[in-house]
Amino acid sequence: NLIKHSLLELANKNISIEKVHLFGGATSHSDVYEWKHASEIVKYGIHNFYSKKDSVLKYLYKTFELGDNPIGLNPISSNSKNIKNYDVSDTVKGHFEYKKNLQTILKNL
């Protein structure tokens, strides 16, 4: 939630940024309006990397957020051309594997 709310605050103040990379994010994927609004201030896009094999998000996030689905497990729901989703499930098998696989993930963009 922190990243999304920070982007929304920047959007409300008309402050733009270059690019955003999200890895295993623990915020809702389905806030379509909020994600579209947040993406409008990011010049080179919001890049969401998610893994369907992230058991931390699969069990803990869903338990504490009453079944909601996080962006770390799913694509961000948005029709914005400025939001790109990448399924890295073949490379990232768990929540703590993003850092060690970062070079591979970014090389395959």
What are these regions (language model features)?
Residues 57-109:
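C-terminal catalytic-base region of ester-bond hydrolases, centering on the histidine
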